Amino acid sequence: MRTRIPASLLVISLVAVTASVGCGGAEAHDAKDPTSSKSSGGGDGKGVKQGDKAPTFTLDSMNGAGKMTIAPGKVTIVDFWATWCEPCKKSFPKLQELYVKYKASGLEIVAVSVDDEKNGITDFAKTHGAKFPVGWDDGKKIADKWKPENMPSSYIIGKDGLVKHVHRGYHDGEEAEVEKELKALL
């Protein structure tokens, strides 16, 4: 005799696992077509890793911060995110707290949206309290270089331009670990 597991329990379990790990890579979602195979290069294990030289880029800020880039001689968090990503809604306020706390010590945050369209990006940033620079990776050219595997994916870049830490996805309480890493670098 087999025991049947209620469908609602399976759905709840799937939602919990997805929320705790993070959204799939940028290729896992297309704003108009969730089954799209558009790729940002994530998921192949060949993305930017700890110890790598951070790929350079310049991006226009959508919230009035001018040009966004990895500032030489500063500790920078490069955060890949999307408006459709549930864990990103939790991580943005935590990034803002870190930004306020450590900006005077030299912390920069560069938030790179991998959304297919720019509609909603600025509203998302406002709704979730982001005062740090937020930009749109039109055509996913930056994501193609970095190859984030999950949303959000955060890369902590040291003053020397090397990737010191990589965080894929977001889980509650992760900001304590990130803060410890930042303190050691600032």
Describe the residue ranges of each PLM region.
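N-terminal targeting signals for export/organelle localization
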Residues: M1-T56, H165, A176-E179
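Thiol/disulfide oxidoreductase modules built on the thioredoxin-like
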Residues: K74, D123-K131, D137-L185
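Hydrophobic beta-strand anchors of alpha/beta hydrolase catalytic cores
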Residues: I77-V78, I109
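Thiol-based oxidoreductase modules, predominantly thioredoxin-like and allied folds used
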Residues: G106-K118, A130-G139
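Conserved redox-active cysteine motifs that mediate thiol-disulfide chemistry
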Residues: F80-E97
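Conserved hydrophobic/aromatic "anchor" residues
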Residues: F57, F80-W84, F124, F132, ...
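A short beta-strand-turn-helix
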Residues: V48-G51, T56-T76
